[in-house]
Amino acid sequence: MALLSVAPLQKPLTSCSPFSTTMPTLGVCTPRKVVTPSIIMCSTTAVSDAGAKRRIANHHSNLWGDDFIHSLSTHYEAPSYRERAERLIKEVKEMFTEIEDGLSITPLSDLLSRLSMVDSIERLGIDRHFKMEIKSALDYVHSYWSEKGIGCGRESGVTDLNSTALGLRTLRLHGYPVSSSVLEQFKDEKGQFATSSIQTDGGEIRSIFNLFRASLVAFPNEKVMEDAQIFSTIYLKEYLEKIPLSSLSRQIEYVMEYGWHTNLPRLEARHYMDVFGYNEMPWMSYGNTEKLLELAKLEFNIFHSIQQRELKHISRWWKDSGFSQMNFVRHRHVEYYTLASCFAIDPQHSAFRVSFAKMCHLVTVLDDIYDTFGTMEELQLFTAAVKRWDPSATDSLPEYMKRVYTVLYETVNEMAQVAKKSQGRDTINYARHAWEAYLDSYMKEAEWISTGCLPTFEEYYENGKISFGYRISMLQPILSMDIPFPHHILQEIDYPSRFSSLAAGILRLKGDTRCYQADSARGEEASCISCYMKENPGLTEEDVVNHIHGMVDDLIKELNWELLKPDCNVPISSKKHAFDICRAVHHGYKYRDGYSVATNEIKDLVMITVLEPVPL
């Protein structure tokens, strides 16, 4: 939302300098070079030119100086690293062949061995090299799937919780039609989940761990998955309080921290490399385990060199845009790029990562203009200019808006040209309609502020799903990919599809729970929390926040279904990046509004996944 503001445009207030320290967060304990920013907060009151009263938010300035970004270097671009990785890829494919031929496993363990192999490769972030092998392994497992689940092997004789839970999760994530009802048979007369009596303590813990992981991909109305999550959460928390630190305990801590809907594949890979070892797949030789780990580290570092190249492009775009001269907006281009590169980890998807970072930064700039800095008259002029979509539309705009409009116009058109090459058709009208709807939703919020109106919860929520900007951050980036998005598939993903509505709803609700207090302090009263409290005066603020969290949990299950439902006309691969945008942005709201205050977990994420390679 927007309106009255205070402060003239000024030069950027920051720069950053690197120094050596130890990373204290996210379970990565190796010493590394980090960037400690100089945090200078923008003032909250001032008078701009022409005497217009303006508000500005108390946002800290850019943490990552352009000079620092362009000083980054790496030696992992050398061909020798790529050649070594290619040799290891061939050797891992041979491991799959040995499993297929039964050379390294027996009929008593062939199902769990396949599942463990697929699971480890995915968690190490190298699964893109083994799509055919993974499909073959999962087809094999699914061929032995029954209403009671599976055992460790096709000749096990009895089903077990560990194999069934891991199978349920993995098969479901790959679109196989598997029912959660298989878990019912593992509940005892008290409703508790029981593991095999012959399992060791470590085996029992791993079974409950995989039960918890399976429960995270629940669909709506799956009571057994709700029971599984409650039971496994209590069990694992008690376990973590009792035992010393170990590889398994660190895995449990990570998954309980990030789950699936705030997990980022590159962050998970970085963490898993530190705990991956022989115990993950005891049937595999030590040498083969080391090869998997070496490949994961090489791939991580080779991609690190790609990140540096793309990040320099983003930083140059940001500097050339003139946004660095605007101290009333948040400068989070590096953070947005980091999120993109933490889930779009295929090197070929460079256009997606760059487009996502640019779109998100444009959304943030406009959010700060419409929410705080712009006057009502200026916002009306800017909205009208975007609807004209003509370079000459800047004539009626104030100086600071002219530059914003020009960068928006040029960037959107440039992305449309990229999409035209990948999709084989002109997509500029998709983008224009999305931006028009986005700015219209902002104008509605600006009117609420100017009139002191507090809308109904439903009115605010429906408008807020558009004003959050999910559609903007998703549409042009996915169209830049080499995945075809014909009109009928795009309709299933883009607004106002069920998929898009759920993803945007999750982010609007979650974002409001993190931002509503700061927004209210700036005069932006309307939020999911305030609107719901108005309609339910008997509830406390805490009651409403808890209710909103419950709504988010329900929407997540519905989004799971929209992504993973079997026999769908839209393949999972077509929806996956749109889904991953939702969970990446959700990640930024896990502890706080990580986009307004990017000095904590998000800063750590940049350092761990972008700035530093993993030691080989």
Swiss-Prot record:
GO molecular function: 1,8-cineole synthase activity; magnesium ion binding; myrcene synthase activity; sabinene synthase activity; terpene synthase activity
Catalytic activity as recorded in UniProt: (2E)-geranyl diphosphate + H2O = (S)-alpha-terpineol + diphosphate; (2E)-geranyl diphosphate + H2O = 1,8-cineole + diphosphate; (2E)-geranyl diphosphate = beta-myrcene + diphosphate; (2E)-geranyl diphosphate = (1S,5S)-sabinene + diphosphate
Cofactor remark: Binds 3 Mg(2+) or Mn(2+) ions per subunit.
UniProt entry tagged with the keyword Flavoprotein: no
GO CC, any one term: chloroplast
Subcellular location: Plastid, Chloroplast
Principal subcellular localisation of the protein: plastid
One BP annotation, GO: terpenoid biosynthetic process
Cofactor entry: Mg(2+); Mn(2+)
Amino-acid positions noted as binding Mg(2+) 2 in the UniProt annotation, renumbered to this chain: D367, D371
Superkingdom of source: Eukaryota
Alphabetically ordered keywords of this record: Chloroplast, Lyase, Magnesium, Metal-binding, Plastid, Transit peptide
Enzyme superclass (EC): lyase
Residues reported in the UniProt entry to bind Mg(2+) 3: D519
CDD domains, A to Z: Terpene_cyclase_plant_C1
Renumbered ranges of motif DDXXD motif: 367-371
Keyword Nucleus (UniProt): no
SUPFAM superfamilies: Terpenoid cyclases/Protein prenyltransferases, Terpenoid synthases
EC number: 4.2.3.111, 4.2.3.109, 4.2.3.108, 4.2.3.15
Pathway assigned to this chain's UniProt record: Terpene metabolism; oleoresin biosynthesis; Secondary metabolite biosynthesis; terpenoid biosynthesis
Transit peptide feature range: 1-41
Function: Monoterpene synthase (TPS) involved in the biosynthesis of monoterpene natural products included in conifer oleoresin secretions and volatile emissions; these compounds contribute to biotic and abiotic stress defense against herbivores and pathogens. Catalyzes the conversion of (2E)-geranyl diphosphate (GPP) to alpha-terpineol and, to a lower extent, to 1,8-cineole, myrcene and (-)-sabinene.
Notes concerning its domains: The Asp-Asp-Xaa-Xaa-Asp/Glu (DDXXD/E) motif is important for the catalytic activity, presumably through binding to Mg(2+).
Record-stated family: Belongs to the terpene synthase family. Tpsd subfamily.
Protein name in the entry: Alpha terpineol synthase, chloroplastic
Taxonomic source organism: Pinus contorta
Lineage, broadest ranks: Eukaryota, Viridiplantae, Streptophyta, Embryophyta, Tracheophyta
Gene name tied to this protein: TPS-1,8cin
